[in-house]
Amino acid sequence: MKFTKAEARKRRHFRVRQKVVGTAERPRLNVFKSNTNFYAQIIDDTKGVTLVSASTLKMDLKSKSNTLAAQKVAEEIAKKALAANITQVVFDRNGYLYHGKIKAFAETARENGLKF
């Protein structure tokens, strides 16, 4: 049985989520990309609460999902996380390959003060 790209991503995401858990001390930084937008949120899995979120929906980059938009979202989420006293996170790439937009997001978040 041949898998589509979406099915393969879902299987990778399921495998990764079994291992990656966000705690209060080190919450999970989750990313999601659609065809039109890029989203990121920092989640405390023990409480099941989103602590900080950012996306291209709330920025001047509405309906952009390129590497520039991913970098802007990374800057925004890093700024919000540092304001909320969050410096260390666990990166959950949501089954996406560490390439392109995801890589640009991760590197920019690291440059802006998040540690993972």
UniProtKB/Swiss-Prot annotation:
<keyword id="KW-0689">Ribosomal protein</keyword>
<dbReference type="InterPro" id="IPR005484">
    <property type="entry name" value="Ribosomal_uL18_bac/euk"/>
</dbReference>
<comment type="function">
    <text>This is one of the proteins that bind and probably mediate the attachment of the 5S RNA into the large ribosomal subunit, where it forms part of the central protuberance.</text>
</comment>
<dbReference type="GO" id="GO:0008097">
    <property type="term" value="F:5S rRNA binding"/>
</dbReference>
<dbReference type="InterPro" id="IPR004389">
    <property type="entry name" value="Ribosomal_uL18_bac-type"/>
</dbReference>
<comment type="subunit">
    <text>Part of the 50S ribosomal subunit; part of the 5S rRNA/L5/L18/L25 subcomplex. Contacts the 5S and 23S rRNAs.</text>
</comment>
<keyword id="KW-0687">Ribonucleoprotein</keyword>
<dbReference type="Pfam" id="PF00861">
    <property type="entry name" value="Ribosomal_L18p"/>
</dbReference>
<dbReference type="GO" id="GO:0022625">
    <property type="term" value="C:cytosolic large ribosomal subunit"/>
</dbReference>
<keyword id="KW-0699">rRNA-binding</keyword>
<dbReference type="GO" id="GO:0003735">
    <property type="term" value="F:structural constituent of ribosome"/>
</dbReference>
<dbReference type="GO" id="GO:0006412">
    <property type="term" value="P:translation"/>
</dbReference>
<keyword id="KW-0694">RNA-binding</keyword>
<protein>
    <recommendedName>
        <fullName>Large ribosomal subunit protein uL18</fullName>
    </recommendedName>
</protein>
<comment type="similarity">
    <text>Belongs to the universal ribosomal protein uL18 family.</text>
</comment>
